[in-house]
Structure formats: C-alpha cells, structure tokens
A protein has these predicted regions:
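Short beta-strand boundary microenvironments
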Residues: 118-176
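Short helix-loop junctions at transmembrane helix boundaries
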Residues: 333, 347-392, 399-412
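Peri-transmembrane interface segments
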Residues: 20-27, 248-301, 310-314, 321, ...
C-alpha cells in the first residue's frame, strides 16, 4: 500500500491544482489538445481522402468491382461470348457491362474551311461503345450527366461526350489536352474512328473527375461495332458489379478458375487501379504524417510551457510541500496527472468532433477538389495509434518541467530565492 501513497497523494494534488486553476486556462489547454488531435487525424485523413475520392470514382463509374480487359498481346478480349456466359452463371454477380473501345478523333466546326496549316477544332479521344442500360446498371453513368439526356438503346447518331473534351467545361490552353470549342448539348460533331467518319449529335455531357471517363465519347454499341469492323462480338472491356457482401477477390479467383484468364486479364478494382494513383496514396499519406508531426511538436511545446509556468508560479507552494514531507516524486506525479487530464479530455473532444461531426459531414458533402471529391478517411486503428502518440507526448511534456522545478533547493523555493 505504501508504494501507492505517492500516486494517491499525487492524484489528490493534481485534482486540487486543476480545480484551482483558471477556468479559461484549463479550457485553452483542452482546446489546444483537441486541435492537436484533429491535426494528427484530419490533415492526413483529408490528404488520403483526396486520393480515395479518385479511387472511389474509378471503382464506381469505371471498373466497378471486377474489371476484365484484353491481354497486352491482344487488341481485344478473345472469346467474349464465352466469358459472358461464365459471368452469367455466377450468382454473386449483379450486372455486367461489355464495352467496345477504339481511339478516334472528334471535330467541331468541321464544315468551316481552314488553311492547311491550321489544326482545326479537333481533339483526340477514346470512342466507347456501350449498352446504355447495362452500363447504367453497373456504373451509374446516367448519374454523371451535367447537361442533356442519357442515351437509350435506339439512339443512333447520338453520343455522350466527356467534359474534358469540351472547352466550355475544361478551358485549358494546351496542346496536350485538346478540347473542342463551341460544342455543347445539341451540337453536331464529326467522329473519325478506324477509317469510318460519322456525323453525330451531342445528346449529353458527363463529368466524373476521372480521365478514363471524361475524355471519352460514348456511342450505342450496336452502332459503333460496324464502324470499327467488329462483327465478332468480342469486347475490349467488361465491368462487373457484384451483389452486396460479395468479395471481389473470391469472385475474381472463381472467374479465373473457369479459364477466363486464358483470354483476358481479370482484376479486382484494386488490381486495376493506375499505378500513379497507388503512388499518390503513399505520397499523400507521408505528407499528412509529416504535417501532423509538426503539430504534435507544437502541442508538446505548448504543454511544456504551460506546465513549466504553472510549476514556476507555484514554486513556493512546491517548496512548502517538500518541507512538510511530500516527496518530489509525489509532486512530479501530480503534474503528470494534470497532463493526463488535459490529454484525455482534449483527445475525447477531438474524437467526438471527428466521428460525430467531420466524418459524416464530409461523407455527405465531399470537398470539391478539381480532380476528385475528397472525403475524410479515418480508421479506428489509426485513431487509437494517434491518440496514444498524443497521450505519451503530453505525459513527457508534463513530466520534464515538473522535474526541473522539483529538483530545486527546498529552502530557496520557500524563500523565493533564485
């Protein structure tokens, strides 16, 4: 029991010290701790969430849960009808959308006579042939409309155009990112693809903040296939949406077990992520940790200064305590308890703000970045780790100044001598 006496007395002194301290001082320290915790969690969470928004968009509106594409040595997915029959017999699959993809050129104002040296109002693009109903069931393409109407299966000579192909929605003057001028819903453009030339009407504009979608022109597949000489029913991409609860890795392996990998690449949405997206995830996570670490150092210094000033101010009081027999260890423990109080209350307040306020709000109202809808990515494990880091840093910052003051001469402290 004697070993616990310094702890009990230290706790009593800490409680007394907190109660007698200025209410505004306590509030200020707690706010600093809460803001420090938010800095540790939110800054890295938003930076990671910015890239997570890109990943979410690509998964939702492009690859879906499983993505099948042509092998590198082939121009298309061989034996597509066989693959579709395999997919049809897997009960965990909710919907499938095969696509035909071909490079092409879109032209606006193509009837205007230009000099030979002029480039013209044109842009290189990717031409996609889709079944509008199947594509919408898998990727929700119709939800990306920002102008006009969605395609129907009978919409021949009508197309959807990605926003990055139009100057009205992507006004960047660069040869690397060509965009059409004076083109909007209702405009007629000329499409050149695989030697075929077709005049089509823009029925709708789509924007997703993913280049794979926003730099495409979408045709009804039954019209595009004859234009590119594709009469064999082979596709270039197949996006697969799973039923809720189905595991993409398990279904991918099941599809591969049926021999589909002999004719195409079968990937989960994570496998199909572009490498630059994966690299950006790691980079932004590192940046978030660096910025959070700076905030942690600032908070530690703040706690150190507050505890040190508090201890210096009560130097005479500390000397009297030592004079009546209270050990220096007990006094140090009391200041550690004070630091624990500020750390626990501040961290708890920060957790409430994150999980009850910021996280649900940003999920419902993502931050509108130019290339993604940013969300706040926080995990329970990550939150616990950061809370522990802040707690330990606060304890150290509370102990060191108390130790420095307590080690002083007792008589000098009582008499106020330096």
């Amino acid at each position: 029991m004697n070993n616990l006496t310094p702890v009990r007395v230290g706790f009593f002194l800490a409680t007394r010290g907190v109660r007698r301290a200025s209410r505004w001082t306590n509030l200020l320290i707690i706010i600093v701790m809460a803001l420090t915790f938010l800095n540790l969690v939110v800054v890295s969470g938003i930076l990671v969430g910015l890239i997570e928004g890109v990943v979410k968009t690509i998964r939702t509106h492009y690859t879906s849960d499983i993505f099948i594409s042509n092998k590198l040595e082939n121009n298309f997915i061989e034996r597509t009808p066989f693959i579709l029959s395999v997919l049809k017999n897997i009960p965990e699959i909710a919907a499938v959308s095969p696509r035909s993809i071909e490079s092409g050129v879109a032209e606006g104002d193509y009837k205007v006579i230009r000099r030979a040296s002029e480039i013209g109002n044109r842009a290189g693009t990717s031409i996609a042939g889709i079944d509008p109903e199947a594509e919408d069931a898998v990727t929700g393409l119709s939800q990306l409309l920002i102008a006009g109407e969605y395609l129907t299966p009978t919409d021949y000579d009508h197309v959807l155009v990605g926003a990055l192909l139009l100057k009205k929605y992507f006004n960047v003057d660069s040869q690397s990112f060509q965009a059409l001028e004076n083109v909007d819903v209702g405009s007629t453009i000329r499409i050149t693809v695989d030697g075929s030339v077709r005049e089509v009407k823009v029925k709708g504009i789509i924007r997703s903040k993913a280049d794979e979608i926003d730099r495409r022109v979408f045709f009804v597949n039954t019209q595009l296939r004859p234009m590119i000489g594709r009469e064999d029913y082979n596709a270039d991409e197949i996006a697969i949406k799973l039923k809720p609860g189905a595991d993409p890795v398990t279904i991918r392996d099941l599809i591969i077990a049926q021999g589909v990998d002999r004719y195409a690449r079968v990937q989960t949405y994570e496998d199909a992520e572009p490498k630059f997206v994966k690299d950006m995830k790691q980079t932004f996570a590192l940046l978030g940790n660096i910025i959070s670490s700076i905030g942690l150092v600032v908070a530690s210094i703040t706690i150190f200064i507050v505890i040190f000033i508090n201890a210096i101010t009560h130097r005479k009081y500390i000397g009297i305590l030592k004079g009546i027999g209270v050990s220096g260890r007990t006094i140090e423990i009391s200041y550690i308890f004070q630091a624990m109080f500020y750390a626990i209350i501040g961290t708890a307040l920060g957790i409430i703000i994150v999980y009850a306020g910021l996280r649900p709000y940003l999920f419902a109202h993502p931050i509108n970045f130019p290339f993604s809808d940013g969300i706040l990515v926080v995990t329970a494990l990550g939150t616990v780790i950061r809370a522990i880091i802040l707690f330990v840093a606060t304890l150290i910052s509370g102990y060191i100044p108390a130790r420095l003051v307590v080690r002083g001469n007792t008589l000098d402290a009582i008499l106020g001598r330096k």
